[in-house]
Amino acid sequence: RTLSLLCGQLRIPKKELWCIVAGKPIRFGLNEFHHITGLNIDDLPTEKFEPEADYKAFFSELRVPTGEGPNLDELRQGLVTCRAWPTEKRRWFGLLTLLSIGLFGLHTNSRIPFESAKRVFDDEAMKTYPWGRAAYEALVVSIKLLRPIGKTYTVGGLVFVLQAWAYESIITIAERFGNAVNADEIPLLRWGGSRTRSTIESVIAEDIKANGGE
């Protein structure tokens, strides 16, 4: 279902998505991302940030190239030695892994943005950084570069937001395939997963026919 939405995109220059569903456009932008996730979408800071903690030594221990954030392969290698680390270093390691897998949804050789990775080493910076905007921009870039091959495709980023967006935006999809596990949660946590081979076009066509349309 999500692929049907992504393949129906309008070509626009802005950092947002517009998709055609049943002949009508629906929008996926920064505000929609915030509504679904509840994450901070303030502007990304432009000033240089340097944490007091010696992050360079930590990255060097993980064999991360100078001036870059770690990738998942490097973090996996760190699993071998992290058990012997002090609590603070294990916490840094865990947060970096969370960013790589949970927030940015990176492939194994893709790196956490350097400016984002450095925030892990400062508690206040970690709490106040606009993770929502950073995650949204990474997701949109990945989607705009999408080139499906056959019936397969790979999208990086916080992709579960797209499923929640489809359920929140298209009532027919939510009614047919949505599994609302907690109506009081934010949309990202409200819907359980499901799989189907139906396309959005076929579902909407069936709905129109069932309601007396043509």
Predicted regions and their residues:
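Structural stabilizers in ordered domains
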Residues: R1-E214
